[in-house]
Design a protein with these regions (language model features):
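Active-site/ligand-binding-proximal alpha/beta "capping" segment
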Residues: 7-45, 56, 106-122
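Short, well-ordered alpha-helices that flank and scaffold nucleotide-derived cofactor binding pockets
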Residues: 32, 55, 59, 132-139
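Glycine-rich beta-alpha junction loops
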Residues: 14-17, 45-48, 70-75, 84, ...
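Hydrophobic/aromatic beta-strand patches that form the interior of the parallel beta-sheet core
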Residues: 8-10, 41, 67, 101, ...
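Active-site/ligand-binding loops adjacent to catalytic centers
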Residues: 2-6, 58-125, 140, 161-179
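Short glycine/serine/threonine-rich phosphate/pyrophosphate-binding segments
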Residues: 43-53, 126-134, 157
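ATP/nucleoside-binding phosphotransfer catalytic cores, i.e., glycine-rich phosphate-binding loops
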Residues: 115-117, 143-162
Length: 179
């Protein structure tokens, strides 16, 4: 991109426009629908959704819990990353997070299947990972709401068996790259 003036390098991991788009867009839409957000859960990916929405929700209500869903170290879930693997995207401000919760591939797949079966959402495995953490957070609360964004759909997972096989039949579920 440096050599070609008509090319663009977005670099979502370090581009401040990434969280800004969620701060000015996604978070505003959430607050238009809900007066209160008690917890917001997003995947630990580029950091754009987590930081942009998280910052706006904290400004609206400092008591809102901002939670990152993070795969276990060494496990690869498309769109998510473990900070323990060594890379922290430049746009991530860890001080904004109230919690960072690990999710296994197994839980991510089980929740991906539940989203389809129970809610009719043809979501991807990263959405299942985030939903698993949402359920955990909701289980800790007496009342309130937990918000999350479905960041991917299921098309790229169709040949993996995620939607057709029980988790117990998926070989190497904890060592497979789910993308």
């Amino acid at each position: 991109a440096e050599e070609h003036r008509d090319w663009v390098m977005l670099y979502q991991y370090g581009n401040p426009a990434n969280p800004l788009a969620h701060y000015n867009g996604t978070a505003v839409e959430i607050l238009e629908e809900l007066d209160e957000v008690h917890a917001f859960v997003a995947g630990l990916g580029t950091g754009g959704t987590l930081m942009g929405v998280g910052r706006r929700l904290k400004e609206h209500d400092p008591n809102t819990k901002i939670v990152a869903a993070e795969p276990m170290q060494g496990e690869l879930v498309q769109g998510l990353r473990s900070l323990d693997d060594g890379f922290i995207p430049p746009i991530i401000d860890l001080s904004l997070l109230d919690r960072k919760i690990m999710v296994s591939n197994r839980d991510a797949i089980e929740w991906t299947q539940r989203l389809l079966r129970e809610e009719g959402l043809f979501a991807g495995v990263s959405a299942g990972a985030i939903a698993a953490i949402c359920a955990r957070i909701a289980g800790e609360m007496d009342e309130g709401n937990v918000v999350f964004i479905v960041p991917d759909d299921g098309w790229k997972y169709l040949s993996s068996g995620v939607y057709t096989k029980p988790v117990s039949e998926l070989e190497g579920v904890e060592s497979t790259i789910w993308w």
